């Protein structure tokens, strides 16, 4: 028999550059744009499992250069969890390590596994790890001040101008490029949308449990909602600490590996595979009025966020009309 396959499932919690708060100036949406484009990891964790879901290794550390720097950590969405981490440090449940120490262990483990991935590999492996790696390299160089000045200009544009994709930027959805090496990359989110949650039962659970996107157009497809469905524990909430979340995501992967081979590559917007809530309700012979009204109410409220005549408002108004016709 050949060597058993192994899978590294990664998760992280991120902050962003300290200049984000200044540039956003209290605008949460602007800060969010910067945080997504310029993530800095402060909580780094992964779980290595075999195809049966047996845990071969767990690793977790807090990054000294980000967690222990208030100007950085205070930009984090979950900055209020700092006391939780401090208690974990006191109890010996986590440790502070500098980035390059963590990367040494991470690099060794990457060489032992067959595949690497995360619930949102596009963010974790294509943005969070590469940008934190870049940040640390600049932090310990003589050119940091100049680099930060350039980032200030870039972050202002990110916050204040429409997004423009760089057509020249190389993007290979099938591999994680790290320190001169390539590793086959999977995406738990994409696999879940294909193999685990694209079911009538899941979609009805979303409608009954308020697990909808902010606009009501799509079903939620997060690790949290997927795990709720897997365990039938609809009160479950993710801890939003990296190791706990990686363990949950590893369980989701293991469930799918029982019937399917790992899918290499990142599919953009995998939630679209489930279709829209309106399409689903229209396909039902006798959709429950309660479910129709739930989506209707979410969309009716959301449309207020868009000006009259804008394309997305018109789209929501069209959906609303279709839902009214189902009543």
Regions found by a protein language model. Give the residues of each.
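Conserved DEDDh/DEDDy metal-dependent 3′-5′ exonuclease domain
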Residues: 79-199
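Short, charge-rich amphipathic interface segments used for partner binding and complex assembly
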Residues: 315-326
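Conserved non-catalytic scaffold segment of RNase H-like nuclease domains
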Residues: 2-8, 12-129, 133
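Acidic, Mg2+-coordinating catalytic module of metal-dependent nucleases/exonucleases
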Residues: 115-122, 126-127, 131, 204-289
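Charged, low-complexity interaction regions
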Residues: 303-314
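Short amphipathic alpha-helical heptad-repeat segments
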Residues: 285-299
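Acidic carboxylate-rich catalytic motifs and surrounding loops in phosphoryl-/glycosyl-chemistry enzymes
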Residues: 60-63, 190-193, 234-244
């Amino acid at each position: 028999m050949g060597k058993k396959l192994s899978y590294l499932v990664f998760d992280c919690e991120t902050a962003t550059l300290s200049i984000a708060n200044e540039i956003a100036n209290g605008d949460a949406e602007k800060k969010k744009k910067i945080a997504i484009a310029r993530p800095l990891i402060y909580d780094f964790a992964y779980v290595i499992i075999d195809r049966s879901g047996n845990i071969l290794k767990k690793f977790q550390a807090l990054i000294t250069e980000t967690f222990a720097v208030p100007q950085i950590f205070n930009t984090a969405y979950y900055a209020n969890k700092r006391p939780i981490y401090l208690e974990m440090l006191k109890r010996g449940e986590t440790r502070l390590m500098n980035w390059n120490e963590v990367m040494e262990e991470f690099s060794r483990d990457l060489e032992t596994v067959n595949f690497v991935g995360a619930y949102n590999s596009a963010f974790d492996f294509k943005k969070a790890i590469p940008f934190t790696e870049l940040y640390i390299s600049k932090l310990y160089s003589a050119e940091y001040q100049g680099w930060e000045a350039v980032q200030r200009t870039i972050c202002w544009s990110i916050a204040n101008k429409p997004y423009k994709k760089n057509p020249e930027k190389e993007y290979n959805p099938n591999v994680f490029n790290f320190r001169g090496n390539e590793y086959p990359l999977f995406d738990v989110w994409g696999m879940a949308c294909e193999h685990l949650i694209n079911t009538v039962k899941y979609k009805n659970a979303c409608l009954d449990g308020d697990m909808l996107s902010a606009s009501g157009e799509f079903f939620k497809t997060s690790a949290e909602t997927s795990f709720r469905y897997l365990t039938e524990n609809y009160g479950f909430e993710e801890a939003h600490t990296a190791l706990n979340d990686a363990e949950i995501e590893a369980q989701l992967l293991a469930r799918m590996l029982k019937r399917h081979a790992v899918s290499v590559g990142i599919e953009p917007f995998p939630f679209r595979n489930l279709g829209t809530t309106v399409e689903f309700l229209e396909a039902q012979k006798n959709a429950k009025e309660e479910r129709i009204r739930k989506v209707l109410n979410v969309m009716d409220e959301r449309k207020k966020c868009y000006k009259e005549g804008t394309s997305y408002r018109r789209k929501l108004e069209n959906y609303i009309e279709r839902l009214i016709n189902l009543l």
